[in-house]
């Protein structure tokens, strides 16, 4: 042994965890693999003299609390020949074990950690004996109860007849509770006692859900026993009623040939009518008889899975793969007032200037394509506008306004029939049908169009198209500048005041 590197004495006999010889090789260099930290912690937990430093937490299986972190760090520094060791460095080493799933920190408790005895199967350490001899020390792990459970993935079971019920301890973990002797012959005799029914009695006494057992107590004797080289382990995570879970425990019995393996600890809220079973490729037994489900049970199971996914926002990828089964649709009843479909009719938006020009150009091209409208010659006026009296103009303008208000669109045939004294034939459809006429700025346009029609000059088709594409204000201005007779009439005040009121006069004055 090197000076300054005093180590904890190797336990003799069966007094605690007996680690392999390489863990105590004093000739190895300091800091090398003399012993791992979790080995050292287990060793301290087995010794009565360190109970004031580190001890098992009562009530939780595998949980321990470091009462004096500085002292534990000092002892670990002595073992590793590192006198500058402190708890910060030791806690970093413990955090390394989180990823290895050897132990984890207990949330909400300071300096409290919990061993994952599911993971601590040590096939590489064939000399480990996990039982103490004779008297159970005070620092031994508490005897597991029905309420204690782990949330780590369980070990792969190597026998189809193994205990498939979650939350129970296998017979190997029973014998590993520190209450039997340490030699192999005693273990074999105890095994025969267990097969006689002592474990079945224990299961009936502890398990509140023994009715869900699919194998029965007699099936324990046929289990393949784990070797002696492992720590106490759980068969798989607990399925006991959780106060935080929205799902009650299923009354359906578990299936003997299906592994109850959870996909992730984060999916603890999913209903476990049947616990998740791996695909046949991952299962140790690949025969198709493992997946002989009752159709009613499977329908109930898949429906509850669908409800879980939709209600708790879980991914549908958590569904097990069953190639021949279809997930039943989720029966979501809608309220009658929600189920009635309202027919919502949206009105088209008001036509803008660009859309108006597009509509006018399309409607202008439509009459040209028809043979009847294409053969109509341009308008011919019968009598000049100077012979008409203002009364007839007034009457025609009033009638035109009434028809416009009733129909909402520019009437073509009725207006032309009323103007039979002016035109010798019915007029073609107007080239500005979609312009709203009820606006004040558009009202004087009708009057000015009539004024434009009254002189002997008739604009040709290109001029009409140009007028249609022109903004209304510019169109009125051009007509005002080009038509002296209309200017005379508007200046005299007869037509604008009679036809469209003072609004037209104000618009004309503003344009002038």
Swiss-Prot record:
Location of this chain's protein in the cell: Nucleus
Biased composition (Acidic residues): 443-452
Disordered: annotated segments: 136-222, 336-512
PROSITE patterns found in the cross-reference section: ETS_DOMAIN_1 (PS00345), ETS_DOMAIN_2 (PS00346), ETS_DOMAIN_3 (PS50061)
Biased composition regions of type Polar residues, renumbered to the chain: 158-184
Record's compositionally biased regions (Basic and acidic residues): 380-406, 453-468, 479-491
Family: Belongs to the ETS family.
Name under which the protein is recorded: ETS translocation variant 3
Organism: Pan paniscus
